[in-house]
Amino acid sequence: MKRMILAAALVATALSTSMAWAATAPVQKMEADEVANEQMVLYFETGMIGKSVWLVDSRPAGKFIGGHIPGALSLPLDLLKKDAASADKLGIPKTGKVIFYCAGRECTLSVDSAAIFRKMGYLDAWVYRNGVPGWSQKAQPLLAEEAFVKKGNLVLIDTAPAKDSIVTASNKLVQLSLSDLKGDKGQMALGTLSKNAPLVVIDRGDMAAVNAALEELRERDFRRLAYFPLSAWTGTLAPAPALTALSWAPVYGPGQVAPKVFEEAVAAGKFILDVRPAADFARGHFKGAVNVPIEELEKDFAKIPKDVPVFVNCASGAKSQKTFDILGRKGYANVSYLDAEVSCKGELCSIKE
């Protein structure tokens, strides 16, 4: 994001432009059980999460450890469906206000979780429909877990020069003061780095410094951002390596394909399997896609061919990965899946990894 010089003329132009856009932009309709971005931020900033408001992340555990709203509890929808007692283990009083979230408005994991909780007697159950994208849109921090750091293929950012830090063979480390991060040294280290690279700022007990570093990284258009408390690290510390220009490439698991590969499959007319609910599919989907909601997959899997490549998508990657596993157990060896956020209007779809 290019920095703007806040000259009076530019401010006036920006204001007039934003006012004109506001007059024509569609208003997002709030649902009856929905918590808005501003309310969610207020709960966080006033320290209510975990005290008078309970926040539950309905995404798979692998997504949770990569970055979640601070104070959130992890309860994947799949686990909740398999083991109702998993809800009790969270220690949430049935009279308490509990809010579920996942990967944004296209993701229904949070909606389904809230519905289950209401049936279990939690009457004050809400949904933060904007989820992680909405939280990030408000420039709020996401907290990573140690398991994510140990998993590797990250870029760690430490703004405490000359101090021992988290040095591992599977991650890369940039150790610069905040001023250097904003300057030429930061540009040298990060200037050619993929904007999709996951960056984790090391928290040494100063959240103001963490937020300043995260803001600088947002200014540089990095979007996969989180922070991790050094106090939570159980490994050893070591001196940081010499500063170099960094590069990064994604590592895909079995069956997972890059967004570009998936888009090429759509363009080539390959068999695209959309496992979202029928109502979501009706609002928009990839051109030529076939809808078999994951809830119906066990009885309708025969609709899916075994003799041609099959590419699976959902809204966030959670259901598509599960579909890959289900079909694999049924003998399908021709399935690939997209683990990314997907948003569609009609047949116009965007993918955000």
What are these regions (language model features)?
Residues 4, 20-42, 62-100, 104-271, ...:
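Rhodanese-like catalytic fold shared by cysteine-dependent sulfurtransferases
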Residues 41-46, 53-62:
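Mature N-terminal segment immediately following signal peptide/propeptide cleavage
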